[in-house]
Design a protein with these regions (language model features):
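Core catalytic subdomain of AMP-forming adenylate-forming
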Residues: 125-126, 152, 191, 417-418, ...
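Conserved S/T- and glycine-rich ATP-binding loop of Class I adenylate-forming
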Residues: 147, 164, 195, 265, ...
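Conserved pre-ATP/AMP-binding loop-to-beta segment of ANL
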Residues: 252-270, 277, 301-307, 313, ...
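Conserved AMP-binding
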Residues: 151-156, 175, 301, 311-318, ...
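Short hydrophobic alpha-helices that are characteristic scaffold elements of the AMP-binding
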Residues: 162-167, 189, 315, 326-328, ...
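AMP-binding/adenylate-forming domain of the ANL superfamily
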Residues: 79-268, 283-284, 290, 398, ...
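Conserved AMP-binding/adenylation subdomain of ANL enzymes
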Residues: 279-306, 316-356
Length: 647
């Protein structure tokens, strides 16, 4: 970003700078100059006015926070540590572009003939992708509100995401495989009235001359008649022009691009909630726009990169694969072999598709490293960057990784939360950019989560809790003001998200995770509140009390549940009954891997269910049992009736 000089707003002959805080994010009115040209910014500025809150690297932004964050957090130093002196933020797009769709549109113009998406050998160019997204935006109309999109690993989902954003709507991915009642509850919770249709099958998706992306709706999303909630107005995806195709997409008419308030919601995603209902997180456009700009630099993306789309499209990790790629002129690769469950097939696909960037859940990476070690193999030569995140990395696997022929590959550990928009902290653990270690990784080492990215403000609060601020903080939880107030706080006139994670800071500024302040867990890299699972299980008529906690089984983080049967319930089949009951109500990651029927739970001195104590008492012994080795016996305390959820 070019150097910018700060000028002050003249008020009655006096020069001054006006800075105010709005309810969400930072607003300001100031006058600054860019290469001698004066520019104005104000709380009502649109993206083409270069609103300061879209440019957290701007000197005025940093000036606003002088003295308001601890001295140990230095945004300018963090920037140099990641990118090196002299590197700019928007490498592949105009630095003046701030909105995500503006960045995508500019990328389409620069790389129109290059492949944007590759799916099972079929190629969708940037020009075609831009035309489809633009046509969908026209169908949706201006500001369509929350739009539900079936989240499946196909190009349609990407077109849906970009089209909804281009229309000024809020993208809401919904897994077609989750139970209909939960799906309906999610759509009702966010007031969704519009859904996208999807293609009927591979033959409809591709025609003789290339991709068509046809799409009449099949089955109304599988929503069951009689369920409470809004009826969806359904919008079909457009087709590309081609032989025998109806409704062809033409070149979009030239004109002034639609300007959208950066505080408008960009997407809604659901996180686990202690009440038994998921919490919809509302992320504004300014948050995803500034984050994607940082991630392009963090990953060092160029048009020559080929990025695998691996993550579930129901979770925000997929955005860090899709959006930086499609605003850098790189190629996004979707391939079913990525989810085949076979490491040999996965590796053959990576080699065949010439993948350069892998973004993997840490749990998957751990297993992949074991496979590579046992087979004495390494990743294909095309891979230059592996991004991991979602849970703590295993130091033993890091030692194995270092012993492989991986010195040329960046291994980037990342940290973030849905409420702070994708990645907020990162560190190179191995490879050409990693700091040299004094000794190899060993069991018991704590793996750091890294430094804050340039757009992120951080603060270590009471009990060493990590607070994250800056323009990437979400608006809050839709329709849940109390939950929003509990997790989003104003400290020293800055709005922060309370992560609930305890951290420590090393002398070099790198943070290390030290545990949770609450009972939240990570399962398959997804945040889970055990209380949500407990609330669901407590609804089973045969259960009188329940405790849910995390355990490690076969090297994987899983949920385990301990249930106390009601009098008269069939204890011998209760575990299977509860499992079937849950599968009809919640996503698969909320179904415990092991459900154990027990006569009683362990309680604390205050009478609350002790999850850890119950697990310590009732977990089976032996390797792979999930029981903590050497755990002291827990004294028996009779269970009290009807303990549906304690936290």
């Amino acid at each position: 970003m070019p150097d910018l000089s700060i000028a002050y707003t003249p008020q009655g002959g006096k020069s001054r700078e006006e800075i105010t805080l709005r309810r969400l994010g930072i607003a300001h009115r100031s006058r600054w100059s860019h290469r001698g040209q004066p520019c104005w910014t104000s709380p009502r500025s649109h993206v083409n006015h270069k609103s300061l809150k879209q440019h957290p690297q701007h000197p005025l932004w940093l000036r606003m926070f002088e003295g308001r964050v601890p001295a140990r957090r230095a945004p300018t130093r963090a920037r140099t540590a990641f990118f090196g002196a002299g590197m700019t933020n928007n490498r592949n797009i105009n630095g003046a572009t701030s909105d995500l769709i503006d960045a995508f549109t500019e990328t389409v113009g620069r790389f129109s003939a290059r492949p944007a998406i590759v799916h099972h050998g079929h190629v969708l160019s940037y020009r075609q992708l831009g035309m489809l997204a633009g046509a969908l935006a026209e169908r949706l109309g201006a500001a369509p509100g929350v739009v539900a999109v079936p989240a499946v690993h196909t190009p349609e989902t990407v077109v849906g995401l970009l089209g909804v954003l281009a229309a000024g709507g809020a993208y809401c991915p919904v897994d077609p495989a989750i139970p209909p009642q939960r799906r309906q509850a999610m759509l009702t919770a966010v007031g969704c009235r519009t859904g996208l249709a999807t293609a009927t099958g591979p033959d409809d998706r591709y025609g003789p001359d290339g991709p068509l992306l046809a799409g009449p709706l099949l089955d109304g999303w599988g929503l069951e008649p009689g369920l409470d909630g809004p009826a969806l107005g359904l919008v079909g995806l457009p087709r590309l022009a081609g032989p025998d195709t109806a409704d062809p997409v033409a070149e979009p008419p030239a004109g002034e691009p639609r300007r959208i308030d950066p505080e408008q919601p960009a997407y809604l995603l659901f996180t686990s909630g202690s009440t038994g209902q998921p919490k919809p997180v509302v992320t504004p456009r300014r948050a995803i726009s500034v984050t994607v700009a940082s991630l392009r630099e963090l990953f060092g993306l160029t048009p020559d990169d080929r990025v695998l789309q691996f993550a579930s499209l129901n979770w925000d990790t997929c955005f860090e694969e899709i959006l930086p790629t499609l605003t850098a002129g790189a190629t996004l690769v979707l391939d079913a072999e990525a989810h085949s469950g076979s490491f040999p097939r996965f590796l053959r696909m990576v080699e065949r598709e010439r993948i350069t960037v892998l973004d993997l859940p840490t749990a998957f990476w751990n297993e992949l490293v074991l496979h590579l070690t046992e087979e004495r193999r390494t990743l294909p030569g095309s891979v230059r960057l592996v991004v991991i995140g979602g849970e703590a990395a295993n130091p033993a696997r890091l030692a194995d990784w270092a012993a492989l022929d991986t010195g040329r590959i960046r291994l980037l550990n990342t940290y973030g939360s849905t409420e702070t928009t994708l990645i907020t902290h990162a560190v190179d653990l191995h490879g050409p950019r990693a700091a040299e270690r004094a000794r190899p990784w060993a069991a018991g080492d704590r793996v750091p989560i890294g430094r804050a990215l340039p757009h992120v403000l951080e603060r270590i609060g009471e009990q060493d809790e990590l607070l994250v601020g800056g323009p990437a903080v979400a608006l809050g939880y839709h329709g849940l003001p109390e939950a929003t107030g509990a997790r989003f706080a104003v400290v020293d006139e800055v709005r922060w998200f309370r992560t609930g994670d305890r951290v420590s800071r090393a002398p070099d500024g790198v943070l290390t995770h030290r545990g949770r302040l609450d009972g939240e867990l990570k399962v398959r890299g997804i945040r889970v509140d055990p209380a949500e699972v407990e609330a669901e299980i407590a609804g089973h008529p045969g259960v009188t009390a329940v405790a849910v906690t995390g355990a490690t089984l076969a090297g994987r983080s899983v949920l385990v549940a301990y249930v106390v049967p009601r009098p008269g319930a069939t204890a011998g089949t209760l575990d299977a009954d509860v499992r079937a009951y849950l599968r009809g109500r919640v996503p698969g990651h909320l179904v415990p891997s092991r459900i154990t029927v027990v006569p009683e739970l362990v309680l604390t001195a205050s009478g609350k269910v002790d999850r850890a104590g119950s697990h310590g008492r009732h977990a089976p012994h032996g390797p792979g049992s999930g029981r903590t080795p050497g755990a002291a016996p827990v004294p028996s305390v009779p269970a009290v009736p009807s303990v549906p959820s304690q936290h």
